[in-house]
UniProtKB/Swiss-Prot annotation:
InterPro entries: AAA+_ATPase, DNA_recomb/repair_RecA, DNA_recomb/repair_RecA_CS, P-loop_NTPase, RecA-like_C, RecA-like_N, RecA_ATP-bd, RecA_C_sf. It comes from Psychrobacter sp. (strain PRwf-1). SUPFAM superfamilies: P-loop containing nucleoside triphosphate hydrolases, RecA protein, C-terminal domain. One of its GO terms (molecular function) is damaged DNA binding. The gene is recA. The lineage of its organism: Bacteria, Pseudomonadati, Pseudomonadota, Gammaproteobacteria, Moraxellales. This is Protein RecA. CDD domains: RecA.
Length: 349
């Protein structure tokens, strides 16, 4: 760049910082430009690895969707518990009015410190979310769920009234405000979403998520969570076998997936994941039904090995640290997304 252009650029940058504040614009290579993203674990080791950065990114919009009883709320409550362990403050916007505090405590959530709101309508829920984000005091906000964010006009109207695209416009308007504020305050906003079926789809998947297209565009990470089987103890079903696909990821390559067990009343079977992933990378040895770590046998069968790790948390942490070091050693590609996308302007649901 020649001297005249350099002087003009310096003057422009000075004027921008004077008018809009320091660090409004900067070179990407500056030390003041934060490139490393803070993350919060999902509570599932396999999913943290599938996300490519070790967890969910702070300061971003996240969407978690799937069928009923697939583990969406469980996953978000585990993320809240992990965020609280880091000293973070979290809020739960319970639009479905279905939060179970007893179950939340079982998953490790400190319910005394968790902020909870049960809004009357969608506008109120999103306004509360935006105010909390702008406060700069929160680290994570969960909205459960997008489908329950009913517009005020629909609540005040008659049954059977048509409100075409009202929720989609509400979401689009709210996300335009929340996205920038979330980045500035480094607050993660997680939207739980439900699945609906499109009518008359001949080819491709008829499934779609509620709330229009805006959330698909603004979300940095989209997770598709499904129940793929049952976990049994004898004849009794004690949990779900769950698969989570990373449908979109702006922080690392997308389309990775993780499979893990969710035990009823307990959440993700974290230690079973540690054993499976340990065997995969060779940290944990497996000979027949026996599992071993180093020269020590840790159990016959996975269930006994899990009990051993539960009684020896230091060994479990050591194995997990080796797994994370091995699996997250490669620097992820930045800006990888599932599909080419266009900014949403006008949309209907």
């Amino acid at each position: 760049m020649d001297d005249n252009k350099a002087k003009a650029l310096k003057a422009a940058l000075g004027q921008i910082e004077k008018q809009f504040g320091k660090n409004t614009i900067m070179h990407l290579g500056d030390n003041s430009a934060t490139l490393d993203v803070d993350v919060v674990s999902t509570g599932s080791l396999g999913l943290d690895i599938a996300l490519g950065i070790g967890g969910l990114p702070k300061g971003r919009i996240i969407e978690i969707y799937g069928p009923e009883s697939s583990g969406k709320t469980t996953l978000t409550l585990q993320a809240i518990a992990e965020c609280q362990k880091q000293g973070g403050t979290c809020a739960f916007i319970d639009a479905e009015h279905a939060l179970d505090p007893i179950y939340a405590r079982k998953l490790g959530v400190n319910t005394d410190d968790l902020l909870v709101s049960q809004p009357d309508n969608g506008e109120q829920a999103l306004e509360i979310t935006d105010m909390l984000v702008r406060s700069g005091a929160l680290d994570m906000i969960v909205i459960d769920s997008v489908a329950a964010l009913t517009p005020r006009a629909e609540i005040e109207g008659e049954m059977g009234d048509s409100h075409m695209g009202l929720q989609a416009r509400l979401m689009s308007q709210a996300l335009r405000k929340i996205t920038g504020n979330a980045k500035r305050s480094n607050c993660m906003v997680i939207f739980i979403n439900q699945i609906r079926m499109k009518i008359g789809v001949m080819f491709g998947s008829p499934e779609t998520t509620t709330g229009g297209n805006a959330l698909k565009f603004y979300a940095s990470v989209r997770l598709d969570i499904r129940r793929i089987g049952a976990v049994k103890s004898g004849d009794e079903i004690i949990g779900n076998q769950t698969r989570v696909k990373v449908i979109k990821n702006k922080m690392a390559p997308p389309f990775r997936q993780a499979e893990f067990e969710i035990t009823y009343g307990e959440g993700t079977n974290h230690l079973a994941e540690v054993i499976d992933l340990g065997v995969e990378i060779g940290v944990v040895g497996k000979a027949g039904a026996w599992y071993s770590y180093g020269d020590e046998k840790i159990g016959q069968g996975k269930a006994n090995s899990v009990l051993f790790l539960k009684d020896n948390p230091a060994i479990a942490e050591e194995i997990e640290a080796k797994i994370r070091a091995e699996k997250l050693a490669v620097e992820p590609e930045k800006g990888a997304e599932a599909v080419d996308e266009v900014e949403p302007e006008s949309e209907v649901e």
